[in-house]
A protein has these predicted regions:
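Short, exposed beta-strand-loop hairpins at the edges of beta-sheets
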Residues: 49-53
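N-terminal, intrinsically disordered low-complexity tails/presequences enriched in Lys/Ser/Pro
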Residues: 1-8
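Conserved hydrophobic/aromatic packing and binding residues within compact polymer-binding modules
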Residues: 32
């Protein structure tokens, strides 16, 4: 999939938008949505670090491609 030109809003993105991010597949996209739902939304992009499978390295690749 092509990378989006604008950062993706973590609080509004659907599974397809999240799956378009580098290093994020369908399972991780679902985990992001589950964490977002559980927390009532993300307050910071660093909240992605609470998602299973997203560590500092993966977050470093994503941080400029996402927003809240």
């Amino acid at each position: 999939m092509a990378e989006p030109a604008e950062p993706i809003d973590l609080n509004a993105a659907d599974i397809t938008a999240l799956d378009s991010l580098p290093g994020i597949g369908p399972a991780t996209a679902r985990a992001i949505i589950e964490e977002r739902t559980r927390r009532g939304g993300f307050r910071s992009t660093r909240d992605l670090l609470r998602v299973p499978g997203i560590g500092e390295g993966r977050f470093a690749r994503l941080k400029d491609r996402v927003r809240v």
